[in-house]
Amino acid sequence: MFGWLTQTAALAALNLRSLPRRPGTAAVAMSGIAALTGVFAGVLSMASGFEKTMDGTGRADVALVLRSGSTAELNSRFTGEQADVIRYAPGIARDAEGEPEVSAELFWIVNAVGKSSGTEANVALRGIQPTGYSLRKDYRLAEGREFTPGRFELVVGRGARSQFMGLEPGQTIRFGKTEWLVTGMFETGGSVFESELWCDVNVLQSAYQLGNGFQVVRARVDGADGRLQLEEALGDDQRLSVDVWSEKQFYSDQAEDTASLINNIGLPISILMGIGAVFAALNAMYASIAARARELATLRAVGFGSFPTALATLLESVVLAFLGGVLGCAIAWFALNGFQASTLASSFSQVVFNFAVTPDLLGRGIVAALIVGLVGGIFPAVRAATAQVTSALREL
């Protein structure tokens, strides 16, 4: 009578036009898939936002010198004499006055109270030397003033200020036995440094009785071969046992580790929800077929084939899944995109970042929804195509 394609189109249009008469079954299928897509997008946007923050940290022309074998600043250590050897090594750029562009630094963990949680969390307190400001990409003092060397004063990153109490410029905050004055707030283009507090490295040494020691030496290298030249010079020096990193690569590697951990925790949850969404779609489509059994039987009796009937039912499931996916993605976009949070990074301090719901992520969410709709619609489609026409018509 009709070609199978024409029959499928006609049946699919009929099925979709009847959806307003079946709001319950449609809502069950869509809500389950929307929940799946929302959680899926939420997990991925968390990992994406963290990676964006970490990947935006660091400069290709800045080298980090850590003790050999150290994968984080916390487990690195230099004496003051070793830091001076590094400071004057070949391959390091010099400023207009001929001084090496180097900042020997300390990375310390202190506790601050979260604004939303009201509980203490680890925050990075970094001691820097005067050159440390200029070595940071996109550094800008946004409010107040920089700390005065030799005093117990801090400048705080925008992210740290937004997440923790007591970090407004002009306020004082106590870490251990020492009270610090917050003198200003800085920005670094949304990088991980905005989660830190900065002070004079010599004051930090004194406050925690750390002696004349440092954990990392940050240096701007001289030209494209500067880092290689620095690495070779330090490797040949018997007084040192160090690794030389590109600052950008160092933070990029840290981002991969933490993002993988987030995905490893979140994706199994998404998979479990996906299984639940498949069953929700199955139930909804079976209920739809049961409610329209006589209608489908009549269509079969007047000449519509089994294959177009099955395909039209499958298309209905996919359309419902698509609508649920769009709904879930929309909820994720409006609720999570740009949402600020913090997590414990490999440095054992809180890193503040914004969730990033990207177009690529939304596309992956829609694809996941369509897969669920396809899987959830196969068996109901087969049932619709194989139902006994005579049995259904007897009920008329």
Model-derived regions: residue spans:
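Hydrophobic alpha-helical transmembrane segments of multi-pass inner-membrane transport and secretion
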Residues: 23-50, 259-295, 318-327, 371-375
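C-terminal membrane-exit region of the final transmembrane helix in multipass inner-membrane proteins
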Residues: 358-396
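Hydrophobic secondary-structure segments that place a key small or acidic residue at a functional site
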Residues: 102-109, 119-131, 136-203, 210
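Transmembrane alpha-helical interface segments in multi-pass membrane proteins
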Residues: 286, 291-340, 364-372, 380
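Short juxtamembrane loops and helix-capping segments at transmembrane helix boundaries
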Residues: 336-363
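N-terminal Sec/SRP start-transfer signal
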Residues: 1-38
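Hydrophobic, regular-secondary-structure patches
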Residues: 38-124, 143-145, 150, 229-236, ...
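Peri-transmembrane interface segments
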Residues: 46, 50-53, 189, 223-279, ...
